[in-house]
């Protein structure tokens, strides 16, 4: 059964400006696993796209959960990783999480569907 659907769209330049002013933004938004992947990118633009995509995914996830970010769930509570085929995944107790992330030159977007787990 579907618990919720969340969508988020963000301008990549907005993240670029925030990152240039606040390098600690990476630590605030990304988990340790995500930070490792972020730091392995060699091109600065790819780093910004990755950060924007993960930001959008976490916003979309919190919307699907119905709580928003803050009191009940924080950026660092949500670890988005890629499976062996490259598909984005999030593990969250009690839910099956479906994630889609896309980028254009100017925008990153994500859609998350939360399905209640039968277990």
UniProtKB/Swiss-Prot annotation:
It is found in: Cytoplasm. The keyword Lipid metabolism applies. One of its GO terms (molecular function) is magnesium ion binding. SUPFAM superfamilies: 4'-phosphopantetheinyl transferase. It holds the Pfam family ACPS. GO terms for cellular component: cytoplasm. Its cofactor is Mg(2+). It catalyses: apo-[ACP] + CoA = holo-[ACP] + adenosine 3',5'-bisphosphate + H(+). Mg(2+) binds at residues 8, 59. One of its GO terms (biological process) is fatty acid biosynthetic process. Keywords: Cytoplasm, Fatty acid biosynthesis, Fatty acid metabolism, Lipid biosynthesis, Lipid metabolism, Magnesium, Metal-binding, Transferase. Its EC number is 2.7.8.7. Gene3D superfamilies: 4'-phosphopantetheinyl transferase domain. The keyword Lipid metabolism applies. HAMAP family: AcpS. Transfers the 4'-phosphopantetheine moiety from coenzyme A to a Ser of acyl-carrier-protein. Belongs to the P-Pant transferase superfamily. AcpS family. This is Holo-[acyl-carrier-protein] synthase. It comes from Staphylococcus aureus (strain JH9).
């Amino acid at each position: 059964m579907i618990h919720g659907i969340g969508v988020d769209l963000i301008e990549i330049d907005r993240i670029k400006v925030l990152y240039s002013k606040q390098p600690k933004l990476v630590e605030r938004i990304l988990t340790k696993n995500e930070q490792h992947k972020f730091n392995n990118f060699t091109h600065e633009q790819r780093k910004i796209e990755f950060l924007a995509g993960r930001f959008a995914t976490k916003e979309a996830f919190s919307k699907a959960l119905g709580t928003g970010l803050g009191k009940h769930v924080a950026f660092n509570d949500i670890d988005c990783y890629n499976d062996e085929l490259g598909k984005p995944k999030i593990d969250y107790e009690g839910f099956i999480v479906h994630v889609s992330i896309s980028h254009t030159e100017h925008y990153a977007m994500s859609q998350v569907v939360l399905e209640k787990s039968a277990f």
